[in-house]
Every structure is written in C-alpha cells, then in structure tokens.
C-alpha cells in the first residue's frame, strides 16, 4: 500500500509601508503572483526554508519572526495537496545583482487593493488568505515549531 504524502511548502508574508512582497512567476497557467515560497528541502528547518526561499526568489534577506498560519490546500484537478507554513517577518537588506530562481520574472511590492484586484492571477487562493490573516493579526510564536536534527 502506497502512503500518501502532502507537499510541504513555506511562504514569506512581508509588509513594508503598506505593500506586500510578492513574486511574479512563470507557471503552466501563465504568469502568476505568489508569495516568496517553495518546498521544504530534506533536513531543513521550516524557518530556515522560508528565509532561503525568500532570498532565492526576491534577493531580499527575510527574517521570519512569527507564524501566520498553516494551510492545507488540495490543488484542483490534481492529486496534489499542499501543506503551507506561512511566516511573517521583515526584510533587511537586498542583493539587487543576485540572479532570481528559474521561473521568477520579478519581485514586486503590491498593496492589499492591488492583491485583491489581481486575485485571478494568483497561483493559489492561499496568497490572499495568508495576507488577510496577517492583516487580521494572526501571529503565532516560532516556539510552536520544533526541529530535530537527525
């Protein structure tokens, strides 16, 4: 019997001056907006994964400060389910000459109104949900998470 496993992902929710850091990326469905996000790598702590993905996709140094939420999303039309850990925090420093991950067209700062107006171009409904949860004040201590080295 095969054991089903979700795709574990991390995302960075970053607000600065009323705007949110997102990426525009190439997907099978065309250009889409997403938070800086990606898959957890073997042996990696969730918090470290969020910082790494943000740097790779935006060239910004992201410092996770709290957990916004954990989101389970079965992708329509597939047998894939994502388990997303969304982290809030701050960016401190940028490497403008850094090459962004393959498929990332650009990093951009969008207002909440702009995010809502472009929802049909979001990679998933999790993008807006994470931002709205952040705005609603959802903050969970990183102490909630425990990472054990092998």
Report residues per predicted region.
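Short, solvent-exposed loop/turn segments at secondary-structure junctions
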Residues: 4, 30, 71-75
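Conserved N-terminal beta-strand and adjoining loop/helix that marks the start
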Residues: 1-21
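Charged phosphate-binding loop/patch that engages nucleotide di/tri-phosphates or the phosphate backbone
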Residues: 129-150
């Amino acid at each position: 019997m095969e054991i089903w496993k979700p795709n574990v992902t991390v995302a960075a929710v970053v607000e600065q001056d009323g705007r949110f850091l997102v990426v525009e990326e190439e997907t099978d469905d065309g250009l889409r907006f997403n938070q800086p996000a990606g898959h957890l790598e073997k042996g990696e702590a969730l918090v470290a994964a969020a910082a790494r993905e943000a740097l790779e996709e935006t060239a910004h140094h992201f410092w996770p400060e709290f957990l916004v939420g954990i989101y389970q999303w079965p992708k329509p039309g597939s047998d894939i389910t994502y388990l997303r850990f969304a982290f809030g925090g701050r960016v401190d420093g940028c490497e403008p000459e850094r090459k962004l991950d393959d498929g990332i067209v650009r990093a951009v700062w969008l207002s909440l109104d702009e995010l809502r107006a472009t929802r049909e171009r979001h990679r998933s409904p999790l993008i807006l949900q994470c931002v709205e949860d952040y705005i609603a004040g959802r903050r969970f201590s990183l102490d909630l998470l425990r990472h054990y080295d092998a």
